[in-house]
């Protein structure tokens, strides 16, 4: 079982779609969580076919921004619990129902002033189930200054608020692979 999470910053560019196809072909993940698709539900149907993930849930973009999609292989059953423009929360059932776990794809607010709303959502999600849980996505914040490449210096208070939300949610930072 594997999952990838990718902030694609829009799927309107054919090169972005090709890059997504390449990653999915190489890694063959069971789950694919996409953020900032900037696509409607109908537009995402074409993407699902291109990456051979026919099952999924799409939260359409609003105007020209946002948009989430969680796509999965037919080899697993997925029960959708909740979703919003900031998250998709599901239970994954594998191996004829013998293994269950929870996956949350999460997309934190871009606006610094609204991040506290993101952290409250994260904490609320953490209390909804006792199943093993993985939460991945783009939180739009870093845990430590050393994780930030380019741009301005992150205020310590912002990082501390994120660290505290992660701790209160009983999550562990597993790091990431990829570019910013």
Map each language-model feature to its residues.
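A shared catalytic/ligand-binding motif for oxyanion handling
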Residues: 1-180
